[in-house]
């Protein structure tokens, strides 16, 4: 029976550095699943609608950058191996979303946010701190974060132009995946954060969405 490889602290730091580079460097990550947008036709939109959709997708891309950093930070400090594995697996699944959003942004003739390195660093730090406190808090933080992401996705789906089936297909699949991640974190023993904490997280999320819509 094969034994699981044991990584040293240096190994884990190098793996985190590799993950950060794949997350932040353009076109360096690769999805496991094809984008839901590939089966949708491209319909012409007005210039204003195209700019607006690009801004929404840029927000969602940065949200996935934050998710990657959050999971990687938690995986670095998680106490139980099964929790660490769960965080690493969730990060891998989020890569699909990251790639899909980046592809759509480029199709719309726009760019990803220049603020991504800043938000990656902040999210990684918060994830690592949550992991140090306890695995229950770490899992609860995942659930609360995914709840915020789901709210943004639902709002963005309402704002999309009717003719933009490509972006809609991507966001619908992302919403389904994120709801599953939130449920899984709670089922694994995650702590349900109280309303004041969730409110504070929503304020931070608004800072991210307002700043990355254009830059």
From Swiss-Prot:
Annotated protein name in UniProt: 3-demethoxyubiquinol 3-hydroxylase
EC class (word): oxidoreductase
Entry keyword set: Cell membrane, Iron, Membrane, Metal-binding, Monooxygenase, Oxidoreductase, Ubiquinone biosynthesis
GO BP, one annotated term: ubiquinone biosynthetic process
Pfam families with a match to the protein in the record: COQ7 (PF03232)
Reported cofactor(s): Fe cation
Gene: coq7
Superkingdom per UniProt: Bacteria
Organism, scientific name: Pseudomonas syringae pv. syringae (strain B728a)
Protein's UniProt keywords contain Endoplasmic reticulum: no
Principal subcellular localization: membrane
EC number: 1.14.99.60
């Amino acid at each position: 029976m094969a034994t699981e490889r044991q990584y040293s602290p240096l190994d884990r730091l190098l793996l985190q550095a590799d993950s950060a580079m794949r997350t932040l460097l353009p076109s360096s990550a690769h999805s496991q699943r094809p984008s839901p947008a590939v089966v949708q036709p491209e319909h012409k939109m007005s210039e204003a609608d195209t700019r607006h959709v690009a801004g929404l997708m840029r927000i969602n891309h940065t949200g996935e950058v934050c998710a990657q950093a959050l999971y990687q930070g938690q995986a670095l400090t998680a106490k139980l191996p099964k929790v660490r594995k769960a965080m690493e697996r969730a990060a891998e699944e989020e890569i699909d979303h990251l790639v899909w959003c980046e592809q759509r942004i480029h199709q719309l003739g726009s760019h990803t946010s220049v603020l991504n390195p800043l938000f990656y660093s902040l999210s990684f730090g918060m994830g690592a701190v949550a992991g140090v406190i306890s695995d229950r808090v770490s899992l609860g933080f995942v659930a609360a974060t995914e709840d915020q992401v789901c709210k943004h996705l639902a709002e963005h789906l309402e704002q999309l132009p009717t003719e933009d089936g490509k972006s809609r297909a991507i966001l619908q699949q992302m919403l389904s995946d994120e709801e599953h991640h939130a449920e899984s974190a709670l089922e694994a023993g995650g702590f349900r954060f109280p309303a004041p904490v969730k409110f504070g997280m929503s304020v931070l999320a608004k800072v991210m969405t307002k700043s990355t819509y254009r830059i």
